[in-house]
Curated annotation (Swiss-Prot):
Cofactor(s) listed: Mg(2+)
Keywords: Calvin cycle, Carbon dioxide fixation, Chloroplast, Disulfide bond, Lyase, Magnesium, Metal-binding, Monooxygenase, Oxidoreductase, Photorespiration, Photosynthesis, Plastid
Protein name (record): Ribulose bisphosphate carboxylase large chain
Binding locations of Mg(2+): 167, 169-170
Major subcellular site: plastid
Residue positions where N6-carboxylysine is found in the record: 167
Miscellaneous section: The basic functional RuBisCO is composed of a large chain homodimer in a 'head-to-tail' conformation. In form I RuBisCO this homodimer is arranged in a barrel-like tetramer with the small subunits forming a tetrameric 'cap' on each end of the 'barrel'.
Catalytic residues of the enzyme: 141 (proton acceptor), 260 (proton acceptor)
GO biological process, one term: reductive pentose-phosphate cycle
EC numbers, comma separated: 4.1.1.39
GO MF annotation list: magnesium ion binding; monooxygenase activity; ribulose-bisphosphate carboxylase activity
Family: Belongs to the RuBisCO large chain family. Type I subfamily.
C-alpha cells in the first residue's frame, strides 16, 4: 500500500475518526451517497483505510491521520495520477477546517515503475569530473531585463572565476528582451570559453520551461545540439507530466536536469493546510530531476534545520528510517532509484559557507546569486571569493576541524591570502535574516 500521513483539522463537533475516514473515502472509492454501482466491484479491495490517528502535541483540534491506499488505485509510473488521487479533491471537504499532507510512504513495488532522476548524483559527478566537495552555482541577476549578450557575459565571468554552474532564474523563459534561442547561444559560448580557460567542466542551467510541452522539447533539443551539459525545468508550474517527459528525454540524450520549485510555498508554506515540501521532494525524485532547490536553513528563505535535513536525506539517500524528530513519518526504501542533489539557494554569502558545508555535506549545490554578483569588484572576483571560501571549508573539515565552531575563523584565515574573499567578507559581515521558521514540528 501507499501510506499517507495527513494533518487533519476537523470542523467543530466533527470527531477525528469521522474526519480521518472521510479523507480516506473521498481520496479513494467514496462519494457523498451510496450508489448502486458499488455492488459491481469489490470496494473492500479498493477503498482507502484510515488505520491510525494521533493527536498533534501542542496543537488543539489537530490530528495526524494515517491512511493506506491499495496500489491498484494508481497508474504505474505516473506522479500525476498518484497526486490526483491522494490530494486531488479532498482538500475542499466541508467537514474539515484544514488538511495538510505531511508525508507519503511509496512502496518499493511502485517506486520500481518510475525512471526517477535522469542520471543521479554519482553519474553527474563522473560527467563533471568533480569529487569530494559541494558544487558551486550562481543565479544570474537581475533576473529579468538583461539582453542575451550581456547575460552571456555575466555567465562567462562567473564560470571563469571558479563556479561550476550558473543558472537562469525560474521566470526567465523567452521574453521580448531576451528570446530563448539567443540566450542559449550566448550562454553556450560562455560555457565553452570558460572551460577552455579553466580546464574544468562548466554548465549553465538553461531553462527549457515553456508554454507547451512541444516548445519545451524544442528548447531541450537545441540545448543538446549545442553540447551543453544541463537544462532546467520549473516542475510545479510546468506540471508533473511535462517534467517526467523532460526527465526521460534527458536520460536518453545525456543531459542533466536541474529542477526549480517555483510556486512550492503556495502549496507548502501553511503549517496546517496544503502539502509539505517533503512530499513534493519525493514526487520529484520519482518524476525525475538531478538537482532540486531545498532551502538553505541559514539564508533568506524558509527552512528549519532538522526538517530541511530530513527531506534532503529523502532526496539523496537510498534508505531512510522513520524519524518524527526530523519530520519523517515513514521508513522509505528507494530501491536504488538515483539520488537528487539538494540545492541551497537564497540570501547566502561567504560567511554562510562553513554552515552550508557542514549542514548539506558534499552532495549538494551551493548557489550564491547576490552573494556572487554583489561583490564590489565584479562577477569574476565574486566567484573567486566563493570558490576560495568553499575550498578552505572543505580542507578544514577534512583536517578534522569543527566548521560549526571554527567557521568564522576558517573564513578569516582564508581571506588573508585571497583579496577577493577579504572584500566579500567586508561587504556581507552584517547581513542577517533572523526570522523564526514557520515550518516547525
Amino acid at each position: 500500500d501507499i501510506l499517507a500521513a495527513f494533518r487533519v483539522t476537523p470542523q467543530p463537533g466533527v470527531p477525528p475518526e469521522e474526519a480521518g475516514a472521510a479523507v480516506a473515502a473521498e481520496s479513494s472509492t467514496g462519494t457523498w451517497t451510496t450508489v448502486w454501482t458499488d455492488g459491481l466491484t469489490s470496494l473492500d479491495r479498493y477503498k482507502g483505510r484510515c488505520y491510525h490517528i494521533d493527536a498533534v502535541p501542542g496543537e488543539e483540534d489537530q490530528f495526524i491521520a494515517y491512511v493506506a491506499y491499495p496500489l491498484d488505485l494508481f497508474e504505474e509510473g505516473s506522479v500525476t495520477n498518484m497526486l490526483t488521487s491522494i490530494v486531488g479533491n479532498v482538500f475542499g471537504f466541508k467537514a474539515l477546517r484544514a488538511l495538510r499532507l505531511e508525508d507519503l510512504r511509496i512502496p518499493p513495488a511502485y517506486v520500481k515503475t518510475f525512471q526517477g532522476p535522469p542520471h543521479g548524483i554519482q553519474v553527474e559527478r563522473d560527467k563533471l569530473n568533480k569529487y569530494g566537495r559541494p558544487l558551486l552555482g550562481c543565479t544570474i541577476k537581475p533576473k529579468l531585463g538583461l539582453s542575451a549578450k550581456n547575460y552571456g557575459r555575466a555567465v562567462y565571468e562567473c564560470l571563469r572565476g571558479g563556479l561550476d554552474f550558473t543558472k537562469d532564474d525560474e521566470n526567465v523563459n523567452s521574453q521580448p528582451f531576451m528570446r530563448w534561442r539567443d540566450r542559449f547561444l550566448f550562454c553556450a559560448e560562455a560555457i565553452f570559453k570558460s572551460q577552455a580557460e579553466t580546464g574544468e567542466i562548466k554548465g549553465h542551467y538553461l531553462n527549457a520551461t515553456a508554454g507547451t510541452c512541444e516548445e519545451m522539447y524544442k528548447r531541450a533539443i537545441f540545448a543538446r545540439e549545442l553540447g551543453v551539459p544541463i537544462v532546467m525545468h520549473d516542475y510545479l508550474t510546468g506540471g508533473f507530466t511535462a517534467n517526467t517527459s523532460l526527465a526521460h528525454y534527458c536520460r536518453d540524450n545525456g543531459l542533466l536536469l536541474h529542477i526549480h520549485x517555483a510556486m512550492h510555498a503556495v502549496i507548502d508554506r501553511q503549517k496546517n493546510h496544503g502539502m509539505h515540501f517533503r512530499v513534493l521532494a519525493k514526487a520529484l525524485r520519482m518524476s525525475g530531476g538531478d538537482h532540486i532547490h531545498a532551502g538553505t536553513v541559514v539564508g533568506k528563505l524558509e527552512g528549519e534545520r532538522d526538517i530541511t535535513l530530513g527531506f534532503v536525506d529523502l532526496l539523496r539517500d537510498d534508505f531512510i528510517e522513520k524519524d518524527r524528530s526530523r519530520g519523517i513519518y515513514f521508513t522509505q526504501d528507494w530501491v536504488s532509484l538515483p539520488g537528487v542533489l539538494x540545492v541551497a539557494s537564497g540570501g547566502i554569502h561567504v560567511w554562510h559557507m562553513p554552515a552550508l558545508t557542514e549542514i548539506f555535506g558534499d552532495d549538494s549545490v551551493l548557489q550564491f546569486g547576490g552573494g556572487t554578483l554583489g561583490h564590489p569588484w565584479g562577477n569574476a572576483p565574486g566567484a573567486v571569493a566563493n570558490r576560495v571560501a568553499l575550498e578552505a571549508c572543505v580542507q578544514a573539515r577534512n583536517e578534522g576541524r569543527d566548521l560549526a565552531v571554527e567557521g568564522n575563523e576558517i573564513i578569516r584565515e582564508a581571506s588573508k591570502w585571497s583579496p577577493e574573499l577579504a572584500a566579500a567578507c567586508e561587504v556581507w559581515k552584517e547581513i542577517r535574516f533572523n526570522f523564526k521558521a514557520v515550518d516547525t514540528l
